[in-house]
């Protein structure tokens, strides 16, 4: 594995393995303590994206702004 930090897309592809919000929350909790601050910001962005996908039961390249009102 390279030393290059993962991008939002890299994290999103990994998070798409999570099929439920509960599983996603467990992965978020685990990574909260393992990632640096910079990596965590990128990871949280991808996690929010995946949460929107799970909530709407659809995959998105870019989350429409109208979807965010349904996310807790």
From Swiss-Prot:
Endpoints of the signal sequence: none
Pfam family, one: HHA
Outcome following mutation: residue 14 to A: Still interacts with H-NS, derepresses expression of H-NS/Hha coregulated genes but not genes regulated solely by H-NS
Consequence when changing residue 48 to A: No longer interacts with H-NS, derepresses expression of H-NS/Hha coregulated genes but not genes regulated solely by H-NS
Keywords: Transcription, Transcription regulation
Complex formation: Interacts with H-NS; crystal structures suggest each subunit of an H-NS dimer could bind 1 Hha monomer.
Name of the protein described by the UniProt record: Hemolysin expression-modulating protein Hha
Phylogenetic lineage: Bacteria, Pseudomonadati, Pseudomonadota, Gammaproteobacteria, Enterobacterales
């Amino acid at each position: 594995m390279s030393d290059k930090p993962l991008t939002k897309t890299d994290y999103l592809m990994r998070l798409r393995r999570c099929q439920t919000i509960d599983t996603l929350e467990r992965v978020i909790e685990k990574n909260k303590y393992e990632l640096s601050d910079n990596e965590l910001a990128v990871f949280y962005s991808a996690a929010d994206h995946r949460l929107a996908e799970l909530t709407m039961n659809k995959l998105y390249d870019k989350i429409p702004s109208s979807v965010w009102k349904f996310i807790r």
